[in-house]
Amino acid sequence: MAKKSLIQREKKRHKLEQKYHLIRRSLKKKIRSKVSPLSLSEKTKMQEKLQSLPRNSAPTRLHRRCFLTGRPRANYRDFGLSGHILREMVYACLLPGATRSSW
């Protein structure tokens, strides 16, 4: 089980990312716009605004975690579980439609 502080930190990052998502996306869109090209000084101002946003609001700072154990590795997106928890739940028939493979 992961430390509770790490899980809370990840939740905080997720909230920040949701809060600043639209602002970050619009700034990036304006910087990369080829329809109405900006001057170099305008682009640097936009870049400074983008850099002034909180670091933890960037989507690359997020990390998927198992919602039962908080384990950050070997997560399956479809289930939101880590590999060993997924395996245990499949063996206990707690996931409908998932079966053990046999050949």
Swiss-Prot record:
NCBIfam families given in the database record: PRK08881.1 (NF006477)
Protein name as annotated: Small ribosomal subunit protein uS14c
One GO CC term, this protein: chloroplast
Family: Belongs to the universal ribosomal protein uS14 family.
Keyword Transport (UniProt): no
Location within or outside the cell: Plastid, Chloroplast
Keyword entries, A-Z: Chloroplast, Plastid, Ribonucleoprotein, Ribosomal protein, RNA-binding, rRNA-binding
GO biological process, one term: translation
Subunit structure: Part of the 30S ribosomal subunit.
Stretches the record annotates as Disordered: 34-56
Function: Binds 16S rRNA, required for the assembly of 30S particles.
One Pfam family cited in the UniProt record for this chain: Ribosomal_S14
